[in-house]
Amino acid sequence: MADNRTFTMIKPDAVENGHIGGILDQITASGFRIVALKLTQMTQRDAETFYAVHNERPFFGELVEFMTRGPIVAAILEKDNAVEDFRTLIGATNPEDAAEGTIRKKYAKSIGENAVHGSDSDENAQIEGAFHFAGREMF
């Protein structure tokens, strides 16, 4: 995945609260093109693997439990400067600190239930996208 692609997940809290459409609308209205999209459910093993970087952190167990409690929407997005622009669009991890109009300000409940994941680097965007999508699933 080049620097014009990023990976995102709409997390279980936002799916449960019916925010898929609103979030996808905001993403596309911000100039991103969706090149891969799926509704899926992470298993415990999936979540533990995906978030392995956090496995020594005190919140790891809660994170895995949260990410497996319901379906997620995984997507690969395309736009120039995709990773940085998407991080700006979603806002700060804690919705209380997020700028007005950002996805997390609009849809997140708390720092733990913060509606969306966005890759933090081009390298991680490639790794995370490949975790959820086979090459034939990207257009």
UniProtKB/Swiss-Prot annotation:
Q: Which reaction does it catalyse?
A: a 2'-deoxyribonucleoside 5'-diphosphate + ATP = a 2'-deoxyribonucleoside 5'-triphosphate + ADP; a ribonucleoside 5'-diphosphate + ATP = a ribonucleoside 5'-triphosphate + ADP
Q: What class of enzyme is it?
A: transferase
Q: What positions constitute the catalytic site?
A: 117
Q: Name one GO biological process term.
A: UTP biosynthetic process
Which cofactors is this protein said to need?
Answer: Mg(2+)
Q: EC number(s) per UniProt?
A: 2.7.4.6
Localization (cell): Cytoplasm
GO cellular component term, pick one: cytoplasm
- InterPro entries referenced in this protein's UniProt entry, alphabetically: NDK-like_dom, NDK-like_dom_sf, Nucleoside_diP_kinase
Keywords, ordered alphabetically: ATP-binding, Cytoplasm, Kinase, Magnesium, Metal-binding, Nucleotide metabolism, Nucleotide-binding, Phosphoprotein, Transferase
User: From what superkingdom does this record's organism come?
Assistant: Bacteria
This entry's Gene Ontology molecular function terms read: ATP binding; metal ion binding; nucleoside diphosphate kinase activity
Give the matching CDD domains: NDPk_I
Q: Which residues of the sequence carry a binding annotation for ATP?
A: 11, 59, 87, 93, 104, 114
Q: Which family does it belong to?
A: Belongs to the NDK family.
HAMAP family per the record? NDP_kinase
Query: What is this protein's function?
Result: Major role in the synthesis of nucleoside triphosphates other than ATP. The ATP gamma phosphate is transferred to the NDP beta phosphate via a ping-pong mechanism, using a phosphorylated active-site intermediate.
Q: Whom does it interact with, and what assembly results?
A: Homotetramer.
Which PANTHER family does the record associate with it? NUCLEOSIDE DIPHOSPHATE KINASE, NUCLEOSIDE DIPHOSPHATE KINASE DDB_G0292928-RELATED
- Protein name, as recorded: Nucleoside diphosphate kinase
- The source organism is Christiangramia forsetii (strain DSM 17595 / CGMCC 1.15422 / KT0803) (Gramella forsetii)
**Organism taxonomic ancestry:** Bacteria, Pseudomonadati, Bacteroidota, Flavobacteriia, Flavobacteriales
